[in-house]
């Protein structure tokens, strides 16, 4: 996911063998929507919808995928400064997974404490727990690995303890143009949560390695 992933794109790639597809990332509340506007102004592609339209848009995208691929799970990657808008998205009828964005590294998102800066929140467990306890679908949390000052394994265990269904790891390692496979293996060995590995997956060889 680099900026935007929509139903049109996902419907093209699902036939290659994917059983889960992720839409997003979407900004849901006033602060994240404003941050997205700033990102767009400097030339990066971002989804941008008014706060009162975004849930309907996501629902339409979900339905476009389900119409062509009814057996594929659909996930929506979303960001918000508070849990409530994420819980609202989870109520979308055919959405299978709502994914909390704790991985975005755009400066405008970081400035409001979202994206990977979510990992620094003292109330992260409560935030995720609120979504897990009130969501109408499965919950995934996508994190960025190797963030300065953050113990990724500790965060992984925290997320597992909230009851989230999936841990999606952007296994980035600064200065290395490949996934941090050692860290992924360490997390998988020390947790029981379902782990989705990600980063630099651009070949069949890397898919098999991951």
Predicted regions and their residues:
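Surface-exposed amphipathic alpha-helices with a cationic face
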Residues: 14, 59-70, 90, 128-139, ...
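Catalytic cores of alpha/beta
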Residues: 6-15, 83-94, 147-161, 190, ...
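Active-site-adjacent beta->alpha loops and helix N-cap segments on the catalytic face
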Residues: 32-35, 58-59, 84, 106-136, ...
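Hydrophobic faces of well-ordered beta-strands that scaffold small-molecule active sites
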Residues: 1, 19-24, 74-78, 98-100, ...
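N-terminal capping/small domains of soluble enzymes
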Residues: 1-84
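Catalytic cores of RNA-modifying enzymes
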Residues: 155, 159-177
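Short, ordered loop/turn segments at secondary-structure junctions
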Residues: 26, 103-105, 171-172
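A contiguous, low-structure linker/loop signature
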Residues: 88-107
């Amino acid at each position: 996911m680099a900026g935007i992933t929509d139903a049109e794109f996902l419907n093209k790639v699902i036939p290659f063998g994917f059983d889960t597809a992720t839409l997003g990332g979407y900004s849901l509340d006033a602060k994240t929507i404003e941050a997205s506007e700033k990102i767009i102004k400097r030339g990066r592609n971002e989804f941008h919808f008014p706060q009162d339209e975004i849930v309907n848009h996501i629902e339409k995208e979900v339905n476009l995928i389900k119409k062509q691929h009814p057996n594929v799970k659909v996930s929506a990657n979303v960001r918000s400064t508070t849990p409530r808008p994420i819980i609202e998205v989870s109520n979308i009828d055919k959405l299978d997974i709502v994914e909390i964005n704790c991985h975005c590294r755009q400066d405008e998102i970081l400035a409001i404490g979202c994206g990977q800066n979510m990992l620094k929140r003292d109330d992260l467990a409560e935030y995720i727990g609120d979504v897990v306890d009130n969501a109408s679908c499965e919950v995934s949390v996508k994190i960025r690995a190797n963030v300065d000052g953050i113990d990724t394994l500790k965060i992984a265990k925290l997320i597992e303890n909230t009851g989230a269904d999936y841990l999606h790891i952007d296994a980035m390692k600064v200065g290395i143009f490949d996934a941090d496979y050692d860290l992924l293996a360490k997390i998988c060995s020390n947790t029981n949560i379902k782990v989705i590995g990600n980063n630099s997956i651009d070949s069949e060889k890397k898919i098999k390695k991951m």
